[in-house]
Amino acid sequence: IPYQINMTILNKKAPTFKLPSTDNDNFDLSKHVGKNIILYFYPRDNTSGCTTEAIDFNKLLPVIKKNNGIVIGVSKDNLESHMKFKTKNKLKFDLLSDENIKVLKKYKAWGLKKFLGKEYMGIIRTTILINTKGVTHKIWSNVRVKDHAKEVVEELKKINKT
């Protein structure tokens, strides 16, 4: 199977990491315990699916914040690309650069993909919902962009009530 969903981390402490962020600092996952974290991995800045996904999460930010949540986007694009993407789309959340694909691999968001009959290694669109205790609550892998952000936010609302 080309898509290896990382179920080994489901209901376990989310793997910690530090990555360069568009907020001009390193994002350290361990410093955000106490928040519900929507951590989403996307293939590339300024592509149609990735732009739609980012804008959809951005539109839902008020609801996400109301439910003690934050959104963090991760791809292997560099920070310069992320800054342009963030500015162009007026994104109000941070994007992280994983140029060495270490975090992408850790979360199984890097793997074998197929397109037009060709196989290659790339980013598998994946979203991880991490609860306030730093535990991986839900994983969406090989995400279809349409209505995805809404689905994630519905799950966020459920865990915020518990």
Where are these regions (language model features)?
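Chalcogenol-based redox active-site neighborhoods
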Residues: N6-T162
